Amino acid sequence: MKILCEKEAFLKEISTAQEVISNKKNTSIFSNVLLAAQGALLTIRATDTKVTFETSIPVNVLAEGTTTVFCDKLVNVVSALPTKEIELTLCEEQLVITPPNKKISFQLRTLSHESFPCFPQNEGGVSLAVPTSDLRNMINHTVFAVSEDSTRHFINGVHVDFQYGNIICVSTDGKRLAYIEKKGESSPQSFSGVIVPTKILGIVNRKLTPEGSVTLCITSQHVYFFFGGYKFSSVLIEGQFPNYKRVIPDHQERSFCVGRVELMEALKRVSLLVEQKSHRIFITIQQGLLTLSSKAHTQENEIGDAQEEIACAYTGESEVIALNYLYLEEPLKVFTSKEVQVEFTDPAKALTLRAVPNTDCFHIIMPMQTE
């Protein structure tokens, strides 16, 4: 194998391969990236046995061939080269990396590609075309609410469902819930929901372009994303996702509206002095005014306390709500509206956070005790 290629184009794709590979030590074939030169293309593939990535880039193929090489060191070597083009040559069991007309040479040990896994087949799945902007929005609104508790693996991913041509994504950690629904560009067959790991969603999200669409395909064991010459697959998480519909309030009796940026900036300041273990912040709402405080009125804080008032649209009775400020801050960062609305019936029961005007997503937040 011998190829001549653009450094940045090659580096971009092997860096994605590096993200996929979990094991950064050169101990197995799964620490390697596959390079296959054929025709006028170089195919690049990487896997950690659960997530698989594949793409092809145009190169000048001087001699066809296939090999695998330790991905982490390959990225480091290519990054260090000073030229716009690089030459890769397979010599017996070594990949020689050199820039044209430069007295620089790196040799990396290779492993045979014979035992390297193929890209998983997606036969028998259901498919839906989704605009890339919608998919990015769905990922951004859900990944932060996924549970990190490994003993509850069934909520360690985002629940994805197709209903009447729409795609619905839901995530929860047991104390909050994120919900977003988008219309697909094509309608799939009947389908029961699956749980998609956050790792594949994060990698795909970083590769999405502003325009175009993504073909999302789901089989009994895998999820696939196809777009812009990229192919991604991931093993699904097994288990029964909780019945999230039971925790979504049918109706909230009271609500208040507040500027999104104003609330976000106030949270950032007041949270500097909240108790770091619980992240609890206190919100006092009264007519026309919202007060954020790092402590309750009856508490003493060893470090100190912070308080900030901002205007809000509210006409009900005065109430105090305590909650984990991160559960409010993280959705505010991904909303793009000027205002948000917080709906509630009782300060001790679930709150609903929405954009104003109302869109196709909302967040449910369980409050904390005020004392």
Swiss-Prot record:
InterPro entries linked to this entry: DNA_clamp_sf, DNA_polIII_beta, DNA_polIII_beta_C, DNA_polIII_beta_cen, DNA_polIII_beta_N
What are this entry's molecular-function GO terms?
3'-5' exonuclease activity; DNA binding; DNA-directed DNA polymerase activity
Which terms are listed as keywords in the entry?
Answer: Cytoplasm, DNA replication, DNA-binding, DNA-directed DNA polymerase, Nucleotidyltransferase, Transferase
Q: Which Gene3D superfamilies match?
A: 3.70.10.10, DNA Polymerase III, subunit A, domain 2 (3.10.150.10)
Its localization reads:
Cytoplasm
Q: Name one GO biological process term.
A: DNA strand elongation involved in DNA replication
According to its UniProt entry, the function of this protein is described as:
Confers DNA tethering and processivity to DNA polymerases and other proteins. Acts as a clamp, forming a ring around DNA (a reaction catalyzed by the clamp-loading complex) which diffuses in an ATP-independent manner freely and bidirectionally along dsDNA. Initially characterized for its ability to contact the catalytic subunit of DNA polymerase III (Pol III), a complex, multichain enzyme responsible for most of the replicative synthesis in bacteria; Pol III exhibits 3'-5' exonuclease proofreading activity.
Q: What is this protein called?
A: Beta sliding clamp
> What is the native source organism of this protein?
Treponema pallidum (strain Nichols)
Q: Which gene encodes it?
A: dnaN
